[in-house]
């Protein structure tokens, strides 16, 4: 019963659309109706930037921090309390799933990058550092957020095998689940990348 309560709480916490809330409260803008219609930092930046560039950057940074924290902080607390790895990984997946398929938004949501990073920094910090370096490099070169995010995700998955080469394949199942969720949410971006229609944001 305790685990079920934790899982429910984490999903509800992960579902909180901070980007949407911040944009509505501070910029009086509904990002679900503009831009890519995503609730993540990239769409916050893209949409609010048209009205107030300085505010857009602040709100985008705040969105990243809050989306990151809603996964990282609960996991840090649970890890400190010595909960087992199975529960920690379940919590990580649920936090990301909640962000991407929010119960408050009729199971729509963001792309899962910041929340995923928040979860994985607790469980696989070296892999996240590797992914972050790739994200920065690709972002600097191409200036396309989705491309940088997908490249970082690929680097994360590959490095999870390199840094944990002695683990059996089934132990990577949560990583595959998380990667699948994020790739699924990026399918429209992938389509635009293929047809060279994706906008530059970074």
Curated annotation (Swiss-Prot):
Entry's family note: Belongs to the PlsY family.
Its EC number(s): 2.3.1.275
Pfam families membership: G3P_acyltransf
EC primary class: transferase
Keyword Cell inner membrane among record annotations: yes
Membrane topology per record: Multi-pass membrane protein
GO cellular component labels: plasma membrane
Ranges that cross the membrane: 3-23, 61-81, 87-107, 118-138, 144-164, 167-187
NCBIfam families from the UniProt entry: glycerol-3-phosphate 1-O-acyltransferase PlsY (TIGR00023)
Biological function: Catalyzes the transfer of an acyl group from acyl-phosphate (acyl-PO(4)) to glycerol-3-phosphate (G3P) to form lysophosphatidic acid (LPA). This enzyme utilizes acyl-phosphate as fatty acyl donor, but not acyl-CoA or acyl-ACP.
Protein name: Glycerol-3-phosphate acyltransferase
Species lineage: Bacteria, Pseudomonadati, Campylobacterota, Epsilonproteobacteria, Campylobacterales
Pathway: Lipid metabolism; phospholipid metabolism
Catalytic activity field: an acyl phosphate + sn-glycerol 3-phosphate = a 1-acyl-sn-glycero-3-phosphate + phosphate
The gene coding this protein: plsY
The organism's place on the tree of life at top rank: Bacteria
Organism of derivation: Campylobacter jejuni subsp. jejuni serotype O:6 (strain 81116 / NCTC 11828)
Any one GO molecular-function label of the UniProt entry: acyl-phosphate glycerol-3-phosphate acyltransferase activity
Subunit-structure text: Probably interacts with PlsX.
Keywords: Cell inner membrane, Cell membrane, Lipid biosynthesis, Lipid metabolism, Membrane, Phospholipid biosynthesis, Phospholipid metabolism, Transferase, Transmembrane, Transmembrane helix
GO biological process: one example: phospholipid biosynthetic process
Subcellular location: Cell inner membrane
């Amino acid at each position: 019963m305790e685990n079920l309560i934790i899982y429910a709480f984490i999903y509800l916490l992960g579902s909180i659309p901070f980007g949407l809330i911040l944009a509505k409260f501070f910029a009086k803008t509904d990002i679900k109706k503009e831009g890519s219609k995503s609730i993540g930092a990239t769409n916050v930046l893209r949409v609010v930037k048209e009205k107030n560039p300085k505010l857009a950057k602040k709100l985008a940074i705040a969105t990243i921090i809050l989306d990151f924290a809603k996964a990282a902080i609960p996991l840090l607390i649970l890890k400190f309390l010595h909960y087992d790895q199975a529960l920690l990984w379940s919590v990580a997946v649920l936090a990301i799933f909640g962000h991407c398929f929010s119960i408050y938004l009729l199971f729509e949501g963001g792309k899962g990058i910041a929340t995923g990073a928040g979860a994985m920094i607790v469980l696989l910090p070296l892999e996240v550092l590797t992914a972050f370096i790739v994200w920065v490099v690709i972002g600097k070169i191409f200036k396309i957020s989705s491309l940088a995010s997908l490249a970082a995700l690929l680097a994360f998955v590959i490095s999870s095998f390199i840094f944990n080469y002695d683990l059996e394949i089934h132990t990577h199942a949560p990583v595959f689940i998380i990667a699948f969720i994020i790739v699924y949410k990026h399918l429209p971006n992938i389509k635009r990348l293929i047809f060279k229609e994706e906008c530059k944001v970074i």
